[in-house]
């Protein structure tokens, strides 16, 4: 292979890898309720900036994603994924629950 062609091939491969990494970083943070537990139980999110949070209900019954501290409350039907628009949060920890099922362990957003 000729050197200029090899350099072009390497440059294109590097650009594709960088673009793929950038897309992964652009994906909104996501939590999932499955088997009566939130996954992950703790999620780090950006502080002092608004963002979208994806909430997926993989259980057989409707849930109510609720955070009293953040004034967010949304019903999520079985098998549904919703987007919750989150406010800019000061650094700290913020709890969320499934208000329909109080026995479900709470989850935590950690704003950093």
Language-model segments: residues:
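Histidine- and aromatic-enriched segments that form or immediately flank copper-ligand environments
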Residues: 58-78, 107
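Positively charged n-region of N-terminal signal peptides that target proteins for export
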Residues: 1-7
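N-terminal edge beta-strand
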Residues: 25-48
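Bacterial N-terminal signal peptides
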Residues: 7-17
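N-terminal post-signal-peptidase region of extra-cytosolic proteins
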Residues: 34-41, 67-71, 79-83
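Beta-strand cores of secreted/periplasmic/IMS beta-sandwich domains, seen most often
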Residues: 41-61, 81-89, 94-95, 111
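Extracellular/periplasmic metallocenter environments
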Residues: 25-30, 77-112
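Sec/Tat signal peptide C-region and signal peptidase I cleavage site
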Residues: 18-24
